[in-house]
């Protein structure tokens, strides 16, 4: 699967529920997206796979820039790709990187804020490493006090 394409793993009419992927399947799509990462500076390659309520999958990888602040994390790439294609309702995201044992990768603070704003508090984030270790948390568990619409 290309990190630039979306995948629709299941088909269904508006009246029949869409069967979502297992956590392991979503992580595997994130792992495949990781292969496309552009990380010449940190060599820290990250992949993400985002599932919409309709069952569509959007993947992303991190893309680094020599001006580090212009780099983009895999989680935001996947979310922005989905938003740009008209999706607005998300259920889960998987993110994977090569992290030490017993430490699945965790989204950075900027990604947690964007995830919170675009996915909502009850969506699930599945964090994984290449050793097969998984950890899942709700968005509100990752960012319990977000800067959100209530400030406006």
What annotation goes with each model-predicted range?
Residues 59-152:
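Zn2+-dependent cytidine deaminase-like catalytic core
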Residues 1-28:
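Short, compositionally biased leader-like segments
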Residues 42-43, 72:
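Short glycine/proline-enriched turns and hinge-like loops at secondary-structure junctions
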Residues 16, 39, 67-69:
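Short, surface-exposed loop/turn motifs that are enriched in glycine and acidic residues
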Residues 30, 48-49, 78, 82:
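Small-residue (primarily alanine) positions within well-ordered alpha-helices
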Residues 43-52, 126:
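Short beta-strand scaffold segments in enzyme catalytic cores
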Residues 24-39:
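Short, basic/aromatic recognition patches
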């Amino acid at each position: 699967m290309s990190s630039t394409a979306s995948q629709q793993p299941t088909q269904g009419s508006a009246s029949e529920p869409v069967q979502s992927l297992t956590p392991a399947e979503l992580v595997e799509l994130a792992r495949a997206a990781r292969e496309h990462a552009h990380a010449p500076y940190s060599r820290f390659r990250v992949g993400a796979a985002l599932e919409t309520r309709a069952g569509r999958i959007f993947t992303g990888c991190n893309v680094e820039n020599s001006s580090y602040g212009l780099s983009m994390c895999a989680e935001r790439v996947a979310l922005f790709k989905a938003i740009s294609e008209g999706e607005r309702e998300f259920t889960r995201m998987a993110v994977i990187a090569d992290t030490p044992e017993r430490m699945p990768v965790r989204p950075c603070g900027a990604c947690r804020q964007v995830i919170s704003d675009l996915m909502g508090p009850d969506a699930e984030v599945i964090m994984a490493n290449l050793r097969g270790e998984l950890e899942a948390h709700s968005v509100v568990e990752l960012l319990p006090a977000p800067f959100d619409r209530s400030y406006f």
